A protein has these predicted regions:
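Catalytic domains of carbohydrate-active enzymes, especially glycoside hydrolases
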Residues: 87-106
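Active-site acidic/histidine proton-transfer and metal-coordination neighborhood
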Residues: 22-35, 60-63, 128-234, 244
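Glycine-rich, proline-tolerant flexible connector loops at the mouths of alpha/beta enzymes
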Residues: 103-113, 126
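Short hydrophobic/aromatic-enriched beta-strand-loop microsegments
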Residues: 117-125
Length: 321
């Protein structure tokens, strides 16, 4: 398991423009109910067939066009399918506004395409603020990320509690508060948010779960944020991880409305596409975000199990409420 977002999957050979356009054509036929589309033409499934036909007729309307949810693509999930410039093209094509967690060296490419990085990397998730031994390295990386975001006008920097390493939860929380207080004043000065991500510790599959991660419950992370006591200290509300560890996703969105600074998506189980092969019903969750007045970004962070452009088209459409 990587301890840093700088360790990204290797990229395949870049796609040609023709192949990218071919993928676009394929994605235009994707329906809002995922794998059902693969069965839709079946004569013994007339309801699905009708839905699929309607989706194909209205394919041009399936991008993010309503403007209520500002959508982003999380770079590490799709880096092996497209090079960075191509991924930016995909984001624009889908109506997304950001490609996030990318290497800052690629940020000029974001600007070229009129995109932002909704949230930036800092330190890794294994060695975090719950252990004072790592405060210095975390602080240095967070400072550097804040500076980069301030220069480009990007809003958020990611941060993590770190793994338990036999540290009691109450001690880990106190250490986090102490560590974040060392950097939050700088974030305030630079007008950049620091977003603490809650991760699941139940799934023992690389990048689908993080056994040993201390900040594995929403309320635990929110309590740390409250004790830091800054409007620049926020929660990265990852719907996939919250569903696995806590459930009650909409209730938690409403309860923690004042603290949510960024949102991630994925289907559960499997951190897969947002389709009918997983259990999370995304449209009402997106509507709940709109209802609480959330104006931040929603990052699509699933690991494709099929054509990535078709899966992204479907996910972006489903979240466009």
């Amino acid at each position: 398991m990587s301890d840093s977002f700088s360790s990204l999957p290797d990229r395949d050979e870049p796609l040609s423009r023709r192949r990218l356009l071919e993928g676009t054509a394929l994605a235009a036929g994707a329906v809002a109910w995922g794998a059902t589309a693969n069965r839709a033409a079946s004569a013994d499934d007339p309801v699905a067939a009708k839905r699929n036909a309607a989706a194909k007729r209205n394919a041009a309307d399936k991008a993010a066009t309503k403007g209520n949810i500002h959508q982003s693509l999380v770079e590490w999930c799709y880096a092996k399918h497209w090079n960075f410039d191509e991924l930016c093209q995909v984001a624009k094509q889908l109506g997304c506004e950001s490609v996030e967690l990318a290497d800052p060296k690629d940020w000029p490419t974001l600007k070229k395409h009129g995109l932002v990085s909704a949230i930036a990397r800092s330190h890794g998730f294994e060695k975090g603020m719950n252990n004072p031994d790592y405060h210095e390295i975390c602080t240095d990386k967070i400072h550097a990320a804040i500076d980069a975001c301030a220069e480009y006008g990007f809003p958020n920097v990611i941060t993590f509690t770190g793994f338990r390493e036999d540290i009691p939860d109450d001690v880990g929380a106190k250490n986090c508060v102490d560590g974040f207080k060392k950097v939050i004043g700088y974030a305030e000065k630079k007008k950049v948010n620091l977003c603490l991500e809650m991760l699941n510790s139940r799934v023992d599959i690389e990048m689908k779960g993080h056994p040993g991660y201390q900040g594995d419950h929403t309320d635990y992370c929110v309590e740390i944020i409250k004790q830091v006591g800054s409007p620049r200290m926020k929660l990265l509300f990852d719907i996939y991880h919250v569903q696995i560890m806590d459930g009650d996703v909409i209730t938690r969105i409403r309860r923690h409305a004042d603290y949510i600074g960024h949102v991630h998506t994925a289907g559960n189980p499997g951190r897969r596409e947002l389709d009918d092969q997983q259990e999370i019903n995304y449209p009402p969750i997106m509507r709940a975000l709109v209802e609480i007045g959330y104006t931040g970004y929603v990052g699509q962070e699933f690991i494709p199990t099929r054509d990535p452009l078709a899966g992204l088209t479907q996910a972006v459409a489903w979240c466009d409420v």
